[in-house]
Design a protein with these regions (language model features):
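Active-site-adjacent loop/tail segments of enzyme domains
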Residues: 134-161
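Accessory terminal helices/loops
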Residues: 152-163, 170-246
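Conserved beta-strand hairpin/beta-sheet module of binuclear metal-dependent hydrolase folds
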Residues: 1-43, 116-127, 132-133
C-alpha cells in the first residue's frame, strides 16, 4: 500500500493532517476531533499516534478525546506541556519511527517554546512557525528573537523542494503585506493570484514549496535576526492600505 497524505480544514482557517503508510497512521495537530475522525475514516485509517507541532489549544484541543477514543499516543515537545499533556516528549529528538511512518523532527522555538517542524516524505508540516507568505506571531507565550533564529537557522537550512503545509491558511492576509513591502515581487503576486484562483473555484490552496516561500515570503527573505524581529513587529500592527487587485 502506498503512503497517503491528507490535509483537512476546520474552524475557519486551521489545518490538521493525516499521514498514512501501510497499516500505520498518525494525525498532526487535530484540534477538531470530529473532523480528524472523519478524515481518518475516509482513508480507512486508525491513527495510533497524535503529533503536535506546538501546544496552542486550537491545535491540541482534540488530543484528549482522540487519545481516549483511539488509544493513540500523543507526542509533542515538553516545553509546551503547560498547554497539553504529551505521552512522549519530542525534545532532543531528530527522528521518529512510528511503525512504517518515519519522520524528521526539527525543533523551531519562537511561536511557542516547544514549536517543532515535522518532515515526512517531501513535506514540511510547519505548524504556526511558518505560514504561506508569513510566519506566526509571538503574542501567546512566544519570543520574536527565537522565532527569527528558527526561521534563519532551522528553516533556512532545509531543502527548498519541500512542500510547505502550515497550521493555518492565512495566505490571503499575508501576501498583501509582502506586496506592500515589495510591490515588485512577482513571486508574491503570482502566489496571491494562485491562492485567490483556488478560493474562487471552491478549492483549497495548493501547497507552496520552501523555495517558493524563500522568493515570496518576507520573513524568509530577511537576512538577520533584527530584520525578522522588525518585520514581525510591523506585521503585528499592519493593516492594508488598499486591496491588492485580482
Amino acid at each position: 500500500m502506498t503512503a497517503r497524505f491528507a490535509r483537512a480544514r476546520y474552524r475557519k482557517d486551521n489545518y490538521l493532517y493525516l499521514l498514512v503508510d501501510g497499516d500505520d497512521a498518525a494525525l498532526v495537530d487535530p484540534g477538531d476531533p470530529g473532523v480528524a475522525l472523519a478524515v481518518a475514516a475516509a482513508y480507512g485509517a486508525t491513527p495510533r499516534w497524535i503529533l503536535h507541532t506546538h501546544g496552542h489549544a486550537d491545535h491540541t484541543g482534540g488530543s484528549a478525546e482522540l487519545r481516549a477514543r483511539l488509544g493513540a499516543t500523543v507526542l509533542g515537545h515538553g516545553a509546551d506541556a503547560g498547554w497539553f499533556a504529551p505521552d512522549q516528549d519530542l525534545a532532543g529528538r531528530s527522528r521518529l519511527d512510528l511503525g512504517a511512518l518515519s519522520l524528521r523532527v526539527h525543533e523551531a522555538p519562537g511561536h511557542t517554546p516547544g514549536s517543532v517542524l515535522l518532515e515526512w516524505r517531501g513535506r514540511l508540516l510547519t505548524g504556526d512557525t511558518l505560514f504561506w507568505g508569513g510566519c506566526g506571531n509571538c503574542r501567546h507565550g512566544g519570543d520574536p528573537r527565537r522565532l527569527a533564529e528558527s526561521l534563519l537557522h532551522v528553516v533556512g537550512g532545509l531543502d527548498g523542494a519541500l512542500e510547505v503545509h502550515p497550521g493555518h491558511d492565512y495566505a490571503e492576509a499575508n501576501l498583501p503585506f509582502a506586496l506592500e513591502l515589495d510591490p515588485g515581487s512577482a513571486a508574491a503576486r503570482d502566489r496571491l493570484a494562485e491562492v485567490r484562483a483556488a478560493a474562487r473555484a471552491g478549492a483549497e490552496p495548493p501547497a507552496s514549496t520552501l523555495a517558493g516561500e524563500r522568493d515570496s515570503n518576507p520573513f524568509l527573505r530577511a537576512r538577520t535576526v533584527e530584520a525578522v524581529v522588525g518585520l514581525r513587529a510591523r506585521r503585528d500592527e499592519w493593516t492594508p492600505r488598499s486591496p491588492v487587485p485580482g
